[in-house]
Amino acid sequence: MGQKINPLGFRLGTTQSHRSLWFAQPKKYSEGLEEDKKIRDCIKNYVQKNIRISSGMEGIARIEIQKRIDLIQIIIYMGFPKLLIEDKPRRVEELQMTVQKELNCVNRKLNIAITRISNPYGHPNILAEFIAGQLKNRVSFRKAMKKAIELTEQANTKGIQVQIAGRIDGKEIARVEWIREGRVPLQTIEAKIDYCSYTVRTIYGVLGIKIWIFVDEE
């Protein structure tokens, strides 16, 4: 049987870069990793609680963390930064305070920057949130997948594959449904592929959404 590998980790150092940039002593490594997870969860929870657009999407494509001895630099790549920047200084400061409180970092400065990404629907995380929103509103899964593919086509991508697994439409037996448009060369390391897996809780149970987007050939 073919073994599935995470397309992002498979391409690290060629077409993908690390989302966390820092060094640590081997014994301290796990602490740094836990800290990163806390930061990411804290930001996502803050955005979920305070900023909601009609479709219920957070619009975060990715969060990059760079650490130095006296500074933690966090860059949030958002598809719809208006959500966080409407009353910008106050919102960002509030988020900074929340993260600082969560981390309890006294001797390190925390800096948060927000970057807008063009073509938000060309990013799998934002697309997965869109599909999750549709499934929660009981839209048929095929309709949701086709709509997602239409949105990515507007973002000038070369190919997309969407997979939904679980008790689809409340059926007794769980199954996997997928749809592909264009090319998605998972075996080619030079192919820049964006990927995300997303869990959505519907009234029928938990569904898993996986999205592969073929952005460009290096």
Swiss-Prot record:
The SS bond pairs are none
Q: Which GO terms describe its molecular function?
A: rRNA binding; structural constituent of ribosome
At the top level, the lineage of the source is Eukaryota
Sorted UniProt keywords: Chloroplast, Plastid, Ribonucleoprotein, Ribosomal protein, RNA-binding, rRNA-binding
Identify one Gene Ontology CC term for this UniProt entry.
Answer: cytosolic small ribosomal subunit
Query: PANTHER family of this UniProt entry?
Result: 30S/40S RIBOSOMAL PROTEIN S3 (PTHR11760), SMALL RIBOSOMAL SUBUNIT PROTEIN US3C (PTHR11760:SF19)
Tell me how this protein assembles. Answer: Part of the 30S ribosomal subunit.
**Per its record, how is this protein called by name?**
Small ribosomal subunit protein uS3c
